[in-house]
């Protein structure tokens, strides 16, 4: 039994150390990458999103349809 207990202890030791190292290594990279990707990602998508929304602007289609009626109403009121 003593041989089995020693083997179990040895097996448990390496995994625990490996887990600690693995946890520390990945833990540090994610935050660093997060900040790096966060800044560029927010800037890159921000510009493209604004530009992309401008050309398609699904709101413009309905707005244009309402625009004529709104302009006519404002003109009729002005007159």
Curated annotation (Swiss-Prot):
Relate the induction remark in this record.
By UV irradiation.
Q: Does the keyword RNA-binding apply?
A: no
Q: Where in the cell is it found?
A: Cytoplasm; Cytoplasm, Cell cortex
Q: Where is this region: Disordered?
A: 1-79
* Gene Ontology biological process terms from the UniProt entry: keratinization
UniProt keyword annotation of Cytoplasm present? yes
Where is this chain compositionally biased, Polar residues type? 66-79
The stretch of residues making up the signal peptide is none
Q: Which GO terms describe its cellular component?
A: cell cortex
Q: Which UniProt keywords apply?
A: Cytoplasm, Keratinization
Q: Where is the composition biased (Low complexity)?
A: 1-26
Modification after translation (UniProt):
Cross-linked to membrane proteins by transglutaminase.
- Describe the function of this protein: Cross-linked envelope protein of keratinocytes. Involved in UV-induced cornification.
User: In which family does this protein belong, per the annotation?
Assistant: Belongs to the cornifin (SPRR) family.
Name the chain's protein.
Small proline-rich protein 4
Native source organism of the sequence: Homo sapiens (Human)
């Amino acid at each position: 039994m003593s041989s089995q207990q020693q083997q179990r202890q040895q097996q448990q030791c390496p995994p625990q150390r490996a887990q600690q190292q693995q946890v520390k290594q990945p833990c540090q990279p994610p935050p660093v990458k997060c900040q790096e990707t966060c800044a560029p990602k927010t800037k890159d998508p921000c510009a493209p999103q604004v530009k992309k929304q401008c050309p398609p602007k699904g709101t413009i289609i309905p707005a244009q349809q309402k625009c004529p009626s709104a302009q006519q109403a404002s003109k009729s009121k002005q007159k």
